[in-house]
UniProtKB/Swiss-Prot annotation:
Expressed in roots, stems, leaves, flowers and siliques. This is COBRA-like protein 4. The lineage of its organism: Eukaryota, Viridiplantae, Streptophyta, Embryophyta, Tracheophyta. Belongs to the COBRA family. Glycans are attached at N29, N154, N162, N201, N226, N306, N321, N340.
Length: 431
């Protein structure tokens, strides 16, 4: 029986990892589109567009890295809006030297502020791409590539293969390039349509299991009806960094350059029992007759990373009746149509859309007012706490259900007794 269970578990993990299925965003992906805009003497000029169709997962600093393998002996003569990280061996070329001669080029976005003649539309953001649900206009990145020693017709062009995408770390798996109907463009005066000479798409999906072996965030709970605070589970994000963590009152925090990110993105975490870079706290704050109020706080424990354009996705049955969100922006997420139990919180632009590194300013918070559905609302059995929590697209570890702040058994009895006492005093005063 144990052997059968183990087999089923590993089979499920393989399927889950291979399909990279996210139950709260089942159709989320990053689509990379190549549009050949013109032919050249020995190849073509193509516009490469990366569209992030993930509702609440974005690519943050240090940005995306795109790679592929050329099918033949192609080279990159030039690029606009991006660059390869290595030129490779171009010694066989005399006169004009290509931008890149590697069989497997690696491409990154340009940084903001580059000269105008190096810029392209939707480029030069340091590889940062917003989430589609947060801001569709920011969920795109583009560059132009001029390929040489390639085909010069639709029949002679060979599609690149073995696409890879880092965003910024591992986790994405890309499928093969597929020829699709040519993209149609509308001129600026909107009176004429043009189309690409040839178009192919590459679809990349994300799997948290491939990205890391431990969660990157955890969740803690508290409530007004119980003094118990349910903390994040111990070592929720693994304790590998326990030896290199820094205490909150350590003098090393005054050292200059402490917050400068490392090239390998090694974190510098504050010493905690959970050792997570980010903690989400859900506090059931107030109970009204027709409404109830929750306070959400996000705390950063990483001294070397801040989070731009952060997102927080939460699944809770009462999110179908959100009345007001006070300090965050909010959008409902309904991946299954009629089931409206998931929402995405994110920072208000120019106010709290940047979660600073660990320290006094390393937190953002907001309160949420929800209307009660009297048929389902209860404080019993942990109903008031979320079912799933995602920060920046990665699922956070929740405490075990038996540790949730419980509603005292005598709460309802005490309330009834209190109400009876008030009525009795009122009756005596009138009498």
């Amino acid at each position: 029986m144990r052997l059968l269970f183990s087999f089923c578990f590993f089979f499920f993990m393989i399927i889950f990892t291979a399909t990279a299925y996210d139950p709260l965003d089942p159709s989320g992906n990053i689509t990379i589109k190549w549009d050949i805009m013109s032919w050249t003497a020995d190849g073509y000029v193509a516009t490469v567009t990366m569209n992030n169709f993930q509702i609440y997962r974005h690519i943050q600093n240090p940005g995306w890295t795109l790679g592929w393998t050329w099918a033949k002996k192609e080279v990159i003569w030039s690029m606009v809006g991006a660059q390869t990280t290595e030129q490779g061996d171009c010694s066989k070329f005399k006169g004009n030297v290509p931008h890149c001669c590697k069989k497997t080029p690696t491409v990154v976005d340009l940084l903001p502020g580059v000269p105008y003649n190096q810029q392209f539309s939707n480029c030069c953001k340091g590889g940062v791409i917003g989430a589609w649900g947060q801001d569709p206009s920011a969920a795109v990145s583009q560059f132009q590539v001029s390929a040489g020693l390639a085909g010069t017709t639709n029949k002679t062009v060979k599609l690149p293969k073995n696409f890879t995408l880092l965003g910024p770390g591992p986790g994405y798996t890309c499928g093969p390039a597929k020829i699709v109907p040519s993209t149609v463009f509308l001129t600026t005066d909107k009176r004429r349509k043009t189309q690409a000479l040839m178009t192919w798409n590459v679809t990349c999906t994300y799997s948290q299991f491939l990205a890391r072996k431990h969660p990157s965030c955890c969740v803690s709970f508290s409530s007004f009806y119980n003094d118990t605070i349910t903390p994040c589970p111990s070592c929720a994000c693994g304790c590998e960094n326990k030896k290199s963590c820094v205490k909150a009152d350590s003098k090393i925090l005054t050292k200059k350059g402490l917050n400068t990110p490392k090239k390998d993105n090694t974190p510098l975490l504050q010493c905690t029992h959970h050792m997570c870079p980010v903690r989400v706290h859900w506090h059931v704050k107030t109970n009204y007759k027709d409404y109830w109020r929750v306070k959400i706080a996000i705390t950063n424990f990483n001294y070397r990373m801040n989070h731009t354009l952060w997102t927080l996705a939460i699944q809770h049955p009462n999110l179908n009746n959100v009345t007001q969100v006070f300090s965050f922006d909010y959008k409902p997420v309904s991946p299954y149509g009629s089931i409206n139990d998931t929402g995405m919180f994110y920072g208000t632009k120019f106010y709290n859309d940047l979660l600073m590194e660990a320290g006094p300013s390393g937190n953002v918070q907001s309160e949420v007012l929800l209307q009660k559905d009297q048929k389902t609302f209860t404080f019993k059995q942990g109903w008031a706490f979320p079912r799933k929590v995602y920060f920046n697209g990665d699922e956070c570890m929740l405490p075990p259900p038996d540790s949730y702040p419980f509603l005292p058994n005598s709460a309802q009895g005490n309330f009834a007794s209190f109400s009876l006492t008030i009525l009795l005093l009122l009756f005596i005063s009138i009498w």
